[in-house]
Amino acid sequence: MAKIKARDLRGKKKEELLKQLDDLKVELSQLRVAKVTGGAASKLSKIRVVRKSIARVLTVINQTQKENLRKFYKGKKYKPLDLRPKKTRAIRRQLTKHEENLMTKKMQRKSRLYSIRKFAVKA
């Protein structure tokens, strides 16, 4: 089997990708048997290509799966941890803008009654 390109895999359905993955795994096992029994050098060099192809197929499967999950959870209140934006621990624990601006009743009354003083600087 020739080297597989990821862009060709992206157009395929999941069933086709899984079938191709099985075919590649069978081919890899045959190549490994050939390696043990002393196969040709061309077969030995093909092991690497097949391994990389398996990795490509798995990568495309996982990426499409994650993309579908992102679409499903778009606009929902709660998302799985791996779909949330990756930030530092400190940033995740920071107060939101709304939480920062919240005031107690006493503070609201005080700010309403005593507004901020404005001073004019004489030049």
From Swiss-Prot:
Its main location: cytoplasm. Disruption phenotype: Embryos show various defects including an inflated hindbrain ventricle and smaller head and eyes. Mutant adults show an increased incidence of cancer, notably malignant peripheral nerve sheath tumors. The keyword ATP-binding does not apply. Transmembrane segments: none annotated. It comes from the Eukaryota. Keywords: Cytoplasm, Developmental protein, Ribonucleoprotein, Ribosomal protein, Tumor suppressor. InterPro entries: Ribosomal_uL29, Ribosomal_uL29_CS, Ribosomal_uL29_euk, Ribosomal_uL29_sf. GO terms for cellular component: cytosolic large ribosomal subunit. It is found in: Cytoplasm. One of its GO terms (molecular function) is mRNA binding. GO terms for biological process: chordate embryonic development; erythrocyte differentiation; maturation of LSU-rRNA from tricistronic rRNA transcript (SSU-rRNA, 5.8S rRNA, LSU-rRNA); regulation of cell cycle; translation. Component of the large ribosomal subunit. The ribosome is a large ribonucleoprotein complex responsible for the synthesis of proteins in the cell. Plays an essential role in early embryonic development. May act as a haploinsufficient tumor suppressor. Component of the large ribosomal subunit. Belongs to the universal ribosomal protein uL29 family. HAMAP family: Ribosomal_uL29. This is Large ribosomal subunit protein uL29. The lineage of its organism: Eukaryota, Metazoa, Chordata, Craniata, Vertebrata.
